[in-house]
Amino acid sequence: MGSEQRRKVIRRRATVLGSTGSVGVNTLDVIDFASRRGEAEVEIEALTANSNVALLAEQARKFRPRFVAIADERLKGELVDALSGEGIEIGAGPSAVEEAGARDADWVMAAIVGAAGLKPTLNAAKRGAAVALANKECLVCAGDVVMNAVRESGGALLPVDSEHNAIFQVFDFERPHRVARLILTASGGPFRTWSRDEMTAVTPAQAVAHPNWSMGAKISVDSATMMNKGLELIEASHIFPIPSERIDILVHPQSVIHSMVEYVDASVLAQLGTPDMRTPIASTFAWPDRSPCPSARLDFAALKHLTFENPAPDRFPALRLAREAVERGGVTPAVLNAANEAAVAAFLSGRLKFLDIAGVTAQVLDEVERRNGPARLTSLEEAMAADAEARSLAERLIAARDA
C-alpha cells in the first residue's frame, strides 16, 4: 500500500499560456521531468506564445499539443510552415490566445506577461480549471473579477510567484483568523545598496541583471524598482483573506526564505528553497500532491547566514504607490499596473530614466484619481478601460519628458 501511494501517477490535461517565456519554458521542463520519471502522465491541450515562432514550433513538436496559438497574427504563416504535416491545430491573434484559455484543460499555467494575459486566464478560471497563476496583472488589475470566477466555477487558483506560493503552502485556510500577518520577502534587486544619486544613472542592462533569479526584462526591472513587490502585495490581498495592512514586506537578499506566515501564537512558518522557479511551478502542477522537480536541493550547511532588512521607501517609492493603490481599491491597481508597464517599456527603450518610472506612475495615478474619483471594479471591461486610459496618459507624460 505504501509503495502504491509513493508511486501515484499525476494525471493532467494541461495548457501553458505563454509557453516560450521564462515561466513557460520552466513549466514544460517540470512536466517533462515528471513525465520521464514516470511520475506524471500529461496531455498538452494548448501552448501559446507572443512572437517566438521557432521555440513554439519546437515545443509543439516535442509535447504534441492539440492546439497552438501565436498572438502576433502576422506570424501565422511562419508557424503554419514550421508545423506543416504535424497535425496540430494552429490559431493566431489575441482571440486565438483567448481560445487557448477556454479549451478543455484541467490545469492551466497562466504565464503571459502583462494585461494580454487577462482574458485567456479569466476564460480558464470561468471554466473551472486549476489555474496556476504566474501573471501578476490578473489579480492586480481584476482581482475581484478573477477570484469571483474561481469561486463560481469551483476551480482553484494556485499562485506561482515564489512568495505567494510559499505562503500558500504554509497558510491555514481553515483557520485564517489565527493568522497575525503575512511577510513577503524581497531580494531587494540589483540596486538594494545604491544611493538615490547612484540610481539616477541606472541603465537598462544593469536593471535586468537580477542578482538571484532568472527572469524576463520587464519583471527584472520591476524587481529593480521593487514594483514587483508592490504588485505582489496587491495580489496577496486577493489570494489570502488578510487585509493589506497586515501584509509586510521584508528585504532578504539571499532569496532562500520565500515568504512567511506569522500566527497569533507568535509562531512563524516559512517555505525555503533555492531561487528556482521550477520549485513553485512543480508545487502547483502536482497540487494537492507533490512531484519530483529538477531544482537544486537547499544545502543548509553552505548557507552560513541569512540576512533581513526593511526596504528603503525613499529609494523605492513604488512600494508606497502600491499600498495607496490597494487602499483606494476599485480600478486604481489596474491604473498603477498599466502606468508602470508603459513607463518600464519606455525605460527599456531608452526614453525614460530609471527613477522616472515611479514618477510617471505616480503622476498617472493622481491624474486618473482627479478625473474620475474612486471607481468600483465589477467587470473585466472596466479594468481594461482603466488600463487603456492609464497607458494613454502615461505615453503622453513620457512624450512630454522626451520633448
Identify what each model region corresponds to.
Residues 1-403:
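Catalytic, metal-anchored helix/loop core of enzyme active sites in primary metabolism
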